[in-house]
Amino acid sequence: MKNLSYLLLLVLAISVTSCLSNYKESSKSLVIRGDYFGQTPPGDSARLFAPGIISTGMNERDFAITPDGNEIFFCREAGNYRYATIFYSRRSDDVWSSPEVFEFCTNPEYKYIEPHLSPDGTKLYFISTMTADSASEGNEDIWVCTKRDGEWSEPRNLGAPVNATSKEYFPSVTVDGTIYYTHPDTATNEESIFRSRLVDGAYQVPEKLGPNVNIGRARYNAFVAPDESYIIIPAYGMPDSFGATDYYISFRDSLDNWSQPVNMGPGINSTFAREWSASVSTDGNYLFFMSDRMGSTSLGKLSTETLQGFHNSPQNGNTDIYWISTKILDELREKARF
């Protein structure tokens, strides 16, 4: 009986391995062409982005695309955030490569999240727990790669005064090099949104943004427009929230005042909890955002196959990436009050 059980388990393992191998090969052999993986651009309604290619059923978040539209970065998490890394896809002769782990983000001892590209596409910023000596895991710091001759350089730690002994998250950079990011306020220990100006090639002492940006009971992962005209803020504990965390937007005037935050509405926010990573494409046409909203499709009769299919599909309760036209930002701007 033991031998029979062992034999059955062996056959099952071989079958599963074969299926996974075939799936991997078929995914790699799929030819994907066109802008944004050949996806139909969204209008006023949010669409799931690249289902089966980027939005797969795993936890996906943090989207960035180069100005020429030929390189895409995003993040995947697994094992309840035990593993988190950045994936990369490149288009050559109009054919996209299958998304793979970015070459500098392969060490399972570290986390790599929140990729962000400078407006000119020459610098890639991201968060990692890696350390300079690679001896142990450190705090989350901002790292940066520079593009030279079409290739990305080894990442370097951005250093002080932006990085400190505490954790930093979600870098977002303007045309003039100003960097916005999340960092604990030393006075309150609350995660808050800071910015540091770049002057003569050196970052200045970070300043905490005011109460129209640091909103709610918690706020983090703010995306700032390249021209610094608006900032998108995921915030928790707001009185008009649709769910646990919603996306809000604040607009900036010529005197560096920020408007009262505006909830970005039910087209973007939902009653689900995890909505805390947004970005706008470098061409300014599309807003990308993370959400764990569920799909509306019924499974029908429950079975091993239907549950496995649901588990391995987007809109299953893990986070996915959505996109929508940035025309919605113009509509929200009309609601801004200073």
Please give the residue ranges for each predicted region.
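Short, conserved micro-motifs composed of acidic
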Residues: 21-338
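C-terminal motif of bacterial Sec signal peptides marking the signal peptidase cleavage site
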Residues: 17-18
